Structure formats: C-alpha cells, structure tokens
C-alpha cells in the first residue's frame, strides 16, 4: 500500500442514471488499476447485495481505493465513492458527494441525459465538484456521441469539448478516464495539521464487529489507538481498527486529511453513527461540525403485517436488524382490526419501500401483507392545533378538523416529444398543475408540473413508463404543503371497516375511486358461503356499493321427488345457518385485495 501525500490523492464519484453503465465502469476502473485481480472479478463488483445485482441498481454506497501510476510516473491514490442513482436515494448521493472533489458524469451515448442524472449533477455543482463528462456505450449500434455531447451542453451547460468517449463493457477509453481523474480532479485541501474532522458518508452493520463506518478525513488525522467523539450524537468510542477499502477491507495504522477509510468501534446501531455526522478526537475535539447534513425524512408510509400472527416477533426483530443498516427506515407498532398486529413503516420513496419489503421476505423468510402507501398530511384542527397524519385510518373526524394540507412536489419529466400528449394527460388525471414545457433538443422535451405527492406514490412511475413505452424519466422534489378539499374514503367489507383499504382522496374523485375500489375488491375476494356486501363510505354516507354473491350448496340433492314440506324444511335450515354464518363469519381477504388501491387503473 502506498502512503500518498495529500497532493497525490483524488476522491471522485460516478453520477449516472439507472442503466447507463455506472457499475460496469466502476468494475473496469478496479480492473485497470489492478485493484481487483481478473480471477476475482465479478460483474457489478461494488454492488454487494444480491438484490442490487438482480435489479441492476445500486442501493448501499460502496467505496474503493485504487493505486494508479499516472503518465508522469507518479503513484496516485484514487478513491472511488460509489453512489446510488435512484431518486429515492438522493440523500445517500448528497452525502457521498460531500466526500469528493470530482465526479464522472456518465451518460449513455444512445439514450442521452435523463432526469435523475440531472438532479445529481445539480447536487454536484452545488458542492463545487469538478465534473468530467463521459459518454458511455459508444460501441452500441444506436450510439450518437456527438449529438449527446451537444445535448449535455444544452441541458446542463457543461463544456463537453474534452468529454471522454468510452465503452465500459469493452474497456475502451478507460485509461483516458483514469488519467483525466488525475489531471482534472483537484487534490483535497492539505489540512493535516488542523483539528481532526471526518465525515461519515456510509455505514453498514456487521453482526460480529458492530457498525462499520465509512468516512472521509476532511482535516487532521485519525489513528487506530484514538478515542473518537461523534459530534451530532455526542457519543464517544474507543477505536478497534481503522483501514482502507481496497475494495476489501485492509487494516492500517493511521489515515490523514484527504483519505477515505473505514472504522470499527463496537458501535451497536447505525443510528448511533449517523451518516453526515462528524467524527473528531475526544481529547482534541474540533470547534464545529461539518455543515450541510439533514436527517433523512420518510416521505412514504405503509403498514407491514405478518400473514401469520405468530410471526410478529420475527418481523419486529427483522425490522430492528434492517434499521441497523438502513437509518432512513422508521417504524412503530400498529394494530388493525382486520390484520392484527403489525408495524407502520416510513420510507424515502416507493423503491425504498419495495426494497425493504423484498429484503424482509428474502433475508428473513417472512410472509408479509403490505398496505397501500400513503404520505404525511398536515391537519388543521378546529381548536387551532395542528396534527400530522401518516395513516389515513387515523384521520380525525370531519367535525374536529378545519382543513387538510397535503405535500406537493415539483416534477420534471424528460421524454421524446411524441409522448407529450400522453404525459400531459397523465399529469392532468393526477391533479397536476402545468408550470412549463421546454424543448431541450428538437425531439426531446422537459415537462414541469406541480402535483400532490399522494398521486405520485401510488403508480405514477409505472403509468408514465407504460404510456411512453419506457422512454420517459422523471425527477421530483418536495416544495411544501397546500390546502385541498380532501376526504377520508373508508371501505366496509361485510359491514366492518377494513383499515388497510382506507385512503384519503380529493372530494371530486371520491365517487370514482370508491366505485372502482369496490368493483376491484369484488374481483379479488373469493366467494364465501354467505353474501358479502362491499361498500365505500365517506363518514356515514355510503357512496358506492356492490356485493359478492354466496356460493350455494344444493341441500335438495338427496330429495328425490316427493314431499314439498321436506324440501322447505331443508331450505329453511340452510337459510338459518347462512344467517348465523353471516353474523359470525369472518371474510378471508387475500393480500392482492389490500393492494387494490394501487391497481385501480389496470
């Protein structure tokens, strides 16, 4: 391992939209610098989670240190800090950008700039990162790097005269990228003699050593014998070991300003070593922490219930374990008359929710029922107080509340302009407010809309992809709360309110949603031995209803001809039994029915 001076360290990350080849490029960089031997190489080397490889996305951040001999013959240390590309994980991106001085902007030479790339580029520009444009996949038959270069200049305003053409798949252009990182990314500030400050940009839970913290030393130095203080959580720890990721962990004695490494200190939970927190020395603490950290706030909520009641303790333990490695996941216990005991969980977005659900089922072997996602509403009460509601079933009664405010987002959609009409129609259906439309190039357009987050979290993304044959991409950010005429829509199954199906909808859409919901439930709930009424109600007013007819057993099969009174007696007995069954019977509602709220447009 080379102990490089600060002037020969380069910290950089890769910014790219999903599927533009970021993980493949990271693989090539590791291979070209000899960091990973060819025999150990596997695709998407930095994506450790099985789920990441399968979905082709990066969820958890990884980091890797590479030794590189540049054209001037000097040995440089390049620290690649991998970032997620999905909009849900923008908080993970923002903190990893803080640990870098430069970024490779990877754009697919056949597809061009996408919305999420743009969002991350703006984050990088805010952090004053040196951006190196890289046009990837130039070996594809549909690639047109010159046109895409103009597009990047037009949309982002970056000078692309020295953009690098490459193909991460074949390795073409990779040496030029490594040299460009050395030449164009500035070295970290030489602050070795200043008080020690290090930024935590990621952490994961190791069952044997506790939380492993990934950090970048901003100033000063940290050695493996130090006692450290985490400035935001005010906790102190004796270090067990520090080291570098090359890309597998390797112990070292000391790390100084500009270097990226990991530490283990028997930390119990990820929440104790929060991402964005500042590490300093206990004996010689820094005066102030590093700026710009905001705690991740959940945007989307849903209920998680085990299908078997006796799995509740297992679910609780699994959530606690997941929270050890995912500080953005929030949960609290919840009970429901229809579903029993479970948890109300908060997520960063729909993808985060899906991933958590999939990890619970896959890694902890649980069968889960997931209720439809909702957002946080701000309810202004008659007595002047305010209440935050993340579960539609707990919305206060109409007579107690004055108004309801819901979160709004500003959304930018990128698409070929053939799909303009389809996208505008979709945004209009979702109560969107048209703001602007810009032509980026002659055949690509950006639509800007403001719309309620609740309309986005259900299936907006799927619908957008369906209506544009997969060509559109979107990016959104929260812009605040607005008052709207919202009502709580309850669903009654056999006269009992089914909490998981309760939703908050706009007054004008209530009838249509209620009607669609009961019709969908009629398809999904299996017939029982008694008639099941399905109703949608606002308060005590039923606005839509239908019913599932009973399965009828032929009790007269044994009566051959003969006495009518015998038949009447049997039919009467059957009717009596059905009446009792209706009063006592519990309707078995399958998981698909609880997701019906999401599938109303199918």
UniProtKB/Swiss-Prot annotation:
Keywords: Cell inner membrane, Cell membrane, GTP-binding, Hydrolase, Membrane, Nucleotide-binding, Protein biosynthesis. The keyword Coiled coil does not apply. InterPro entries: EF-4, EFG_III/V, EFG_V-like, EFTu-like_2, G_TR_CS, GUFP, LepA_C_sf, LepA_CTD. It catalyses: GTP + H2O = GDP + phosphate + H(+). Residues 7-189 form the tr-type G domain. GTP binds at residues 19-24, 136-139. Gene3D superfamilies: 3.30.70.240, Elongation factor 4, C-terminal domain (3.30.70.2570), Elongation Factor G (Translational Gtpase), domain 3 (3.30.70.870), P-loop containing nucleotide triphosphate hydrolases (3.40.50.300), Translation factors (2.40.30.10). Its main location: membrane. It is a peripheral membrane protein. GO terms for molecular function: GTP binding; GTPase activity; ribosome binding. Its EC number is 3.6.5.n1. Disulfide bonds: none annotated. SMART domains: EFG_C. Required for accurate and efficient protein synthesis under certain stress conditions. May act as a fidelity factor of the translation reaction, by catalyzing a one-codon backward translocation of tRNAs on improperly translocated ribosomes. Back-translocation proceeds from a post-translocation (POST) complex to a pre-translocation (PRE) complex, thus giving elongation factor G a second chance to translocate the tRNAs correctly. Binds to ribosomes in a GTP-dependent manner. PANTHER family: TRANSLATION FACTOR GUF1 HOMOLOG, CHLOROPLASTIC (PTHR43512:SF4), TRANSLATION FACTOR GUF1-RELATED (PTHR43512). Belongs to the TRAFAC class translation factor GTPase superfamily. Classic translation factor GTPase family. LepA subfamily. This is Elongation factor 4. The gene is lepA.
